[in-house]
Amino acid sequence: MANITAKDVAALRAKTGIGMMECKKALVEADGDVEEAIKILRKRGELKAEAKAARIAADGIVDVMKEGNVTAMIEVNSETDFVAKNASFQEFVKNLLKTIIANKPADVDALMASTYIDGATTVEAKLKEMIFVIGEKISIRRFVVVNGLART
């Protein structure tokens, strides 16, 4: 059994954004192996995301981003307005807009299968991670992409 220090737990927390106790439990289970602990935390995140799927997410935000001649607008829902005001939630929504502009998916299902803007994971995996970190159901309700100039 590895000797887990507070520094180890803090480093894992800094990498993942997940609570100290969850990080400590994952490190103990992984016998101090940080990469294995991250895998354990991802698996737990997926399980928690599935458990929260039936909840109602009626709050949230609508955001818009323009890059060149491409504009994207998205609605992302959360269970409470408190989460909608959270900086990491808002950053996630901005990154979703960047992902939409880069990939131009046809619908929400295609967006979920797209590579997230960081290139390391899919949008679906990042969404599950956000649900685990924030602790509430988060759902991508809808989005639209306008390519070119709109005239009225």
Stretches found by the model and what they are:
Residues 2-152:
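N-terminal assembly/interaction segments in proteins that build large macromolecular machines
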